[in-house]
Design a protein with these regions (language model features):
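A cross-family phosphate/adenosyl-ligand binding-site feature
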Residues: 1-118, 124-213, 217-394
Length: 394
């Protein structure tokens, strides 16, 4: 995933330094080249050998270490780096960088870098909220540094407040957004729908489907990592929303219709991956419907055709993609959908194929355009998302 990319991790003196060992391991598993720089204070919290074991590269602490290859190491690393993350970043190191002080391997490397630099402060709440620290962070923002807001939680000092280093998964997302993909969607607005809809019968019961939202969430995440400004209109799911994405939660098909159509005019690309109910109860009972000995019937009415509406009202420059979930005649039905709803692409799923459809992390799809059909092998849903976006931007 990150083969050929170089990530420099700067670790300062903080109890949260242990998290960066896990982050380094995660990056190595993605085939990134990882280099770790530590301040001397950081070595009081975690041993450099830990990072050297995980990354298979020398962990640098002292600018004048005699055991180095003949090159000016801070400059050499600065030239290699695709992204630099300083985490946890102490108030001391933040102040040094903001003041232009370069007196150790970490600060000299940061000063020499021209790549994206990200800082994740971690400290006591009062220190973080100190006007001097806030001024330094604002100064760094002005110079193009990205600042990750600390999490709120229970701190090492036994206080509860802002200052906690975010999870490794959050830190990883900031790195991936910068270096995982070329930014071929930069400047584009992309709307993705995901998940099921829920159609109420009474206050207890509802009609829904098996969609988990995984495919739509993967599309939103990959589009964001490729530089798009992403809006994710999501039915009820148990997934963590992708970072840097504007999430619009909805429940019913009518909710989704309103959320999508009110935002469609400003979008460059619309991908409708949600499994929207075709029918909804004609009336919703105010109270729970009691069980009886006889049969029960529920009158259903058609929901609004969101994709049909989008196809009829799209602009000439907009790109529109829909999904087709089929158990038979997949290609024939999907081609009809492509034509009838004025789409640029239909992503066809055969739900009878193992490893495809709802609730799994893989998918097997066929991409259908006006030029023809292309069947993809079984792939992760993020890989499928990449293939879909590749097709849409060709």
């Amino acid at each position: 995933m990150l083969k050929g990319k170089t990530v420099v991790l700067g670790v300062t003196g903080s109890i949260a330094a242990y998290k960066i060992a896990n982050l380094a391991s995660m990056l190595v598993k993605m085939h990134a080249q990882v280099h770790v720089l530590m301040t001397k204070n950081a070595t009081n919290f975690i041993n450099p050998i830990t990072f050297e074991t995980l990354t298979s590269t020398k962990c640098l602490v002292d600018t004048f270490d005699r055991n180095f290859q003949y090159s000016v190491e801070h400059v050499a690393l600065a030239k290699q780096a695709d992204v630099v993350l300083i985490a946890p970043a102490s108030a001391n190191v933040i102040g040094k960088i903001a003041g232009g002080i370069a007196d150790d391997m970490l600060t000299t490397t940061v000063m020499a870098c021209k790549c994206k630099k990200i800082i994740a402060p971690a400290m006591n709440t009062n220190m973080y909220e100190n006007p001097i620290v806030q001024d330094n962070l604002e100064k760094l923002r002005h110079y193009g540094y990205e600042i990750i807001a600390p999490a709120v939680g229970y701190l090492a000092c036994k206080d509860v407040g802002a200052g906690k280093l975010p999870s490794e998964e959050v830190l990883l997302e900031y790195i991936l957004r910068e270096i995982r993909f070329e930014k071929d969607l930069e400047g584009k607005k992309v709307l993705v729908t995901a998940g099921p809809t829920v159609e109420a019968i009474d206050p207890v019961r509802f009609i829904s489907n098996r969609s988990t939202g995984k495919m739509g969430y993967a599309l939103a995440r990959v589009a964001m990592q490729r530089g798009a400004q992403v809006t994710l209109v999501s039915g009820p799911v148990s997934l963590e929303p992708p970072p840097f994405v504007d999430v619009v939660p909805v429940e019913s098909a009518e909710d989704m219709f309103q959320a999508v159509t009110s935002r469609m005019a400003e979008q460059d690309i619309i991908i409708k991956a949600a499994a929207v109910a075709d029918y909804t109860p004609a009336t919703v009972a105010d109270n729970k419907i009691k069980k009886t000995d006889g049969e029960a019937a529920i009158a259903l009415t058609r929901t609004k055709d969101i994709l049909g509406y989008l196809g009829e009202h799209r602009t000439e420059k907009q790109i529109l993609c829909g999904f087709s979930m089929e158990t038979e005649n997949m290609l024939e039905n999907s081609r009809k959908k492509l034509d009838k709803k004025h789409l640029d692409l239909v992503v066809a799923n055969n739900l009878k194929v193992e490893g495809a459809g709802f609730g799994v992390d893989t998918n097997v799809v066929t991409l259908i355009t006006r030029e023809g059909a292309r069947e993809l092998p079984k792939m992760t849903k993020e890989e499928v998302a990449g293939a879909i976006l590749d097709t849409l931007v060709e």
